[in-house]
Amino acid sequence: MDATELLKKDHEAVRQLFAEFESAESDDSKLDTYEDLRQQLIIHARIEEEIFYPAVREADHDKAEKQVKEALTEHQQVKEMLVKLDGMASEVDADFAESIKKLAESVEHHVQEEENDIFVTARKIGNKQLGELGDRLQQRKDQLMEAGVDEDAQSAPQ
């Protein structure tokens, strides 16, 4: 699977988790879904920051530099929102639900920009290299999923 397809698949999984949170009936289900969502977001950001964004920068440094810088800023905003949510996650109340809604909006904004801008720039890498990059992303994602995310969102690398 090429890198952009793998990342789009992740985007869909995150959208699904936001929908699951919204439809969950019990607080326990909502908190479990939040933990899954948190892990997905942190791992997704790590594989982009460690592997995907550097490759996109190499493909077209001038165009990609601004795009990647903005994406990294958005990642940092999401991480800060996760830290806030981590502090609230002892109970699901209106503030927690509203913060999840804001997180969903921020993530969706980031996804749209990434898919419409960065992925277009990434096409300059070429199909074969995107396939190889996708393999590297999947391998790193598998490593991180197996290890689990036990760090707070703020300390996750950028």
Where are these regions (language model features)?
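Small-residue-biased structural context
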Residues: 1-158
